[in-house]
Amino acid sequence: MEDETLGFFKKTSSSHARLNVPALVQVAALAIIMIRGLDVLMIFNTLGVRGIGEFIHRSVQTWSLTLVFLSSLVLVFIEIWCAFSLVKGRRWARWLYLLTQITAASYLWAASLGYGYPELFSIPGESKREIFHSLMLQKLPDMLILMLLFVPSTSRRFFQLQ
């Protein structure tokens, strides 16, 4: 059979069946997108337009702060990209999402303990234990998403078959 091109869409004949995306993977991908979108909305609501401008201005005062600020934006975009790739069954997407969570948690932990720029990204707390507890509470939704991607047999099978 010959491929037909209709504008940007390409119609191809395929003899193999496509595996349906498990509901748990769909929920995880949607949760990633919704959590990151809600994070942005909450920041805008808390700081307002003027506060966002001041935050960006403060974030780009030195090269180190600019690097941290831009890295955090890149991290958010990578997480959203992973969400879309998860639905397509890309095996690497769940591992990349795990890596982004380890990176974010490690930086938050280090910045909160004074190794980095606490005024930009840090978790307030009196002791290491209190900071760690707050960090785990903050990362709880992301840990649940990771569990949805790695623990259920349907999720594991979906990524193995793709």
From Swiss-Prot:
<feature type="topological domain" description="Periplasmic">
    <location>
        <begin position="88"/>
        <end position="94"/>
    </location>
</feature>
<keyword id="KW-0812">Transmembrane</keyword>
<keyword id="KW-1133">Transmembrane helix</keyword>
<feature type="topological domain" description="Cytoplasmic">
    <location>
        <begin position="116"/>
        <end position="162"/>
    </location>
</feature>
<feature type="transmembrane region" description="Helical">
    <location>
        <begin position="95"/>
        <end position="115"/>
    </location>
</feature>
<dbReference type="Pfam" id="PF10767">
    <property type="entry name" value="YbjO_DH-like"/>
</dbReference>
<keyword id="KW-0997">Cell inner membrane</keyword>
<feature type="topological domain" description="Periplasmic">
    <location>
        <begin position="1"/>
        <end position="23"/>
    </location>
</feature>
<dbReference type="GO" id="GO:0005886">
    <property type="term" value="C:plasma membrane"/>
</dbReference>
<feature type="transmembrane region" description="Helical">
    <location>
        <begin position="24"/>
        <end position="44"/>
    </location>
</feature>
<protein>
    <recommendedName>
        <fullName>Inner membrane protein YbjO</fullName>
    </recommendedName>
</protein>
<keyword id="KW-1003">Cell membrane</keyword>
<feature type="transmembrane region" description="Helical">
    <location>
        <begin position="67"/>
        <end position="87"/>
    </location>
</feature>
<feature type="topological domain" description="Cytoplasmic">
    <location>
        <begin position="45"/>
        <end position="66"/>
    </location>
</feature>
<keyword id="KW-0472">Membrane</keyword>
<dbReference type="InterPro" id="IPR019703">
    <property type="entry name" value="YbjO_DH-like"/>
</dbReference>
